[in-house]
Amino acid sequence: MKLQLVYVLISSESDFFLEEFWVSLFSLRRFHPKDKVVVLTDHPTAERVRDRPQLTSMITDLKIIDLPDDYDGRLRSRTLKTSVRNLIDGDFLTIDTDTVICGSLDEVDNLPVKNMGMVPEMH
């Protein structure tokens, strides 16, 4: 793929977002073993990711973003998700952590979309 594949991950011991992400990334790597995967995250989540070498080995670039300490997980996630364009250079495809990839995404590179494309909720 020409596009960078980008995830936003904020997780703590009290949720399953890291586990959901792992399933999503594992499914992505079945079809895109060598493509660039960037994960935008905060410091606490990055530590949890780094504690899992098998997971870390599937990530090309773990970008740790400084966020205010008083932000809860939801606000941290929303802040990163709405800032992706300012944090990633070049073209990218954002993948939600609860997405299971069931086939190649190569055709996304050829979509006739100039600046933005999206999938409707509950598709």
Spans of model-derived segments:
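N-terminal anchoring/stem segment of glycosyltransferases
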Residues: 1-69
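A short, glycine-/small-residue-rich helix N-cap motif at loop->alpha-helix starts
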Residues: 17, 70-79
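A structural signal for short coil/turn segments at secondary-structure junctions
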Residues: 31-32, 88-89, 112
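Short, conserved acidic/polar surface loops in the N-terminal third of protein domains
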Residues: 49-51, 74-77, 103-106
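Short, conserved alpha-helix that lines the donor NDP-sugar binding/gating region
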Residues: 81-86
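Short aromatic/hydrophobic "clamp" motif used to bind/position activated sugar donors
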Residues: 92-93
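The conserved acidic donor/metal-binding loop of glycosyltransferases
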Residues: 96-100
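Conserved donor-nucleotide/metal-binding helix-loop-beta segment in metal-dependent transferases, i.e.
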Residues: 101-123
